[in-house]
């Protein structure tokens, strides 16, 4: 079953989508204040579709 386009994604799901390690996503989060995933219990990150789109753009610009 696939998630809705509007569903929140975990850092692992976003990393797989972008083919980018999770530590890189955390680093980008520390350098780009526009990336603001929702943090839930235990500090787990959940990325909104807008966050994912922003990360796609950042990856594209850094390549």
From Swiss-Prot:
Q: Does the keyword DNA-binding apply?
A: yes
Top-level taxon in the UniProt lineage:
Bacteria
Kindly indicate whether the keyword Transcription regulation belongs to this entry: yes
Which controlled-vocabulary keywords does the entry list? Answer: DNA-binding, Transcription, Transcription regulation
Q: Which InterPro entries match?
A: DNA-bd_dom_put_sf, MerR-type_HTH_dom
- Give an example GO biological process: regulation of DNA-templated transcription
GO MF: DNA binding
* Coiled-coil residue spans: none
Domain HTH merR-type spans what residues? 10-63
Q: Which Pfam families match?
A: MerR_1
The name on file for this protein is Uncharacterized HTH-type transcriptional regulator in himA 3'region
Recorded source organism is Rhodobacter capsulatus
| Organism lineage string | Bacteria, Pseudomonadati, Pseudomonadota, Alphaproteobacteria, Rhodobacterales
């Amino acid at each position: 079953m696939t998630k809705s386009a509007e569903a929140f994604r975990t850092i692992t799901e976003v990393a797989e989508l972008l083919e980018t390690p999770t530590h890189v996503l955390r680093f980008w989060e520390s350098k780009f204040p526009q990336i603001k995933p929702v943090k839930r219990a235990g500090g787990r990150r959940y990325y909104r579709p807008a966050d994912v789109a922003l990360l796609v753009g950042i990856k594209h610009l850094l390549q």
